[in-house]
Each structure stands twice: as structure tokens, then as C-alpha cells.
Amino acid sequence: MSAQPVDIQIFGRTLRVNCPPEQQEALNQAAEDLNQRLQNLKVRTRVTNTEQLVFIAALNVCHELAQERLKTRDYAANMEQRIRLLQQTIEQALVEQGRITERPGNQFE
């Protein structure tokens, strides 16, 4: 689907952005999140310059994204290690099973 113009309110300003209809709800939630972040920053830092608040918020979001990427990378590495260990355990069990079935006297008559 093609993007449609959508008006969103951020920090008292109306912005018109193009957005596919199926993503409008996510856009509105993102706008609400940004609005809340800016309000919290304004109170916490006592900065009144909107541009400065936007830059600080952007830096915070980038930092959070970097932290999440790191956690995802660590999680993936951990899962890969667990999968390798599981594969080794299965292979070892199959080798042991092969040894047991190859022993003389283990055949049914």
C-alpha cells in the first residue's frame, strides 16, 4: 500500500508525515513515546530549548538501541553455543548407541 499523509502532535507541534495505513497505529505510539520522553527530559534537565531536548532524546534512543543490539548479539551467541553443545551431545549419544548395537550378543534371533 502507498503511504498516506498523517498529522501527528509532538511537543506542541503538528508534523505531517507519510505513513502506510497499516503502520499508522505504530506511528502514533512512537509519537506518544517521543512526546513523553521530551516532557520527562524537560522536567529532569530543566532544558527549555526544544532543539536541544530533541537532540538529547535522539541520543538516548540511539544509546538504548545500541544496548538492545548488544543484548541481541550476546543472546544469539549464547544460543549458538547451546546449540553446538546439544549437537555434540546428540552425536555422542548416537556414537554410543552405535557401539552398543554393534557388540556381539546384542542381536535378536
Swiss-Prot record:
Keywords per UniProt: Cell cycle, Cell division, Coiled coil, Cytoplasm, Septation
Gene Ontology annotations for the cellular component aspect, listed alphabetically: cell division site; cell septum; cytosol; plasma membrane
Name of one Pfam family that matches: ZapA
Protein origin, superkingdom: Bacteria
GO biological process: division septum assembly; FtsZ-dependent cytokinesis; septin ring assembly
Coiled coil ranges: 21-97
InterPro entries xref list: Cell_div_ZapA-like, Cell_div_ZapA-like_sf, Cell_div_ZapA_eubact, Cell_div_ZapA_N
Subcellular location: Cytoplasm
NCBIfam families linked: PRK10972.1 (NF008209)
Function: Activator of cell division through the inhibition of FtsZ GTPase activity, therefore promoting FtsZ assembly into bundles of protofilaments necessary for the formation of the division Z ring. It is recruited early at mid-cell but it is not essential for cell division.
Subunit note: Homodimer. Interacts with FtsZ.
HAMAP family: ZapA_type1
Membership in a protein family: Belongs to the ZapA family. Type 1 subfamily.
Name the UniProt record assigns to this protein: Cell division protein ZapA
Species per Swiss-Prot/TrEMBL record: Sodalis glossinidius (strain morsitans)
Lineage of origin: Bacteria, Pseudomonadati, Pseudomonadota, Gammaproteobacteria, Enterobacterales
Primary gene name: zapA
